[in-house]
Amino acid sequence: QVLLAKRMGKKRIIAETGAGQHGVATATVCALMNMQCIVYMGKTDVERQHINVEKMKMLGAEVRPVTSGNMTLKDATNEAIRDWCCHPADTYYVIGSTVGPHPYPDMVARLQSVISEEIKKQLKEQEGREYPDYLMACVGGGSNAAGTIYHYIDDERVQIVLAEAGGKGIDTGFSAATIQLGKMGIIHGAKTLVIQNEDGQIEEPYSISAGLDYPGIGPMHANLAKQQRALVLAINDDEAIRAAFELTRLEGIIPALESAHALGALDKMRFKPTDIVVLTVSGRGDKDIETYLKESGTRTSLQ
């Protein structure tokens, strides 16, 4: 996207970020390309992901905390779009998920499809075939999930399983399970499923994970769910935390809280011993260590 911005003659790059991973990636490329970089991030997320905030600052980006609304990803996206509308001549907005107005959802999915290309290559080497029986990924806006499934969408042999953020439970009012709770609406220029009240006002989502804390979903995933091409599971905070600790202790891999939701979905599935299951661990857990430490202290069942 930054190469595209350079080709278009833009001088200023803006981005939104929830977990901070997209912000760090954008700041990294801007440092490499010597371009001005401004990252919008909800104040709540700045506090809970401050390691990534410091990385962005080290890379030369300006991080602007957003204090409106719930002070999370939706609000950061609002501010980034507002900035973009005010400075269209010199500014390019690097969207970090399959959300926003066309062509962003399609463009981000295509660029992320390097993930499923890599899955095909690795499966061919490891298993002698290019397709798995199950593909699993977490879904907030839907970028890593889109990349994971991109080359398999039309392959009926592959069961797609998406894990969205159930928060404290989908019936509690503290959730970000958009596919299960959402109704058709428009958010940030995309027609998709949106968590909204009966008046059509967008509800504030909740998730322990900053990257899944979004009241919409990429239109591609809303469509796949409607067509019943994907099985969508809501994974609550407790299930995600437990799965993260399990992976850490069994494999020595500390996953991001977002990815932990995909791991939490494993317990809800029943596989045959011969099934090939590919699960995308979309981020590393360095940024979430403080949350994990806090949660392990309060949840004795994790010990």
Residue ranges and their predicted role:
Residues 21-24, 46-48, 73, 101-104, ...:
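Flexible loop/turn segments at secondary-structure boundaries
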Residues 77-107, 129, 154-157, 162-253, ...:
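Active-site/ligand-binding loops adjacent to catalytic centers
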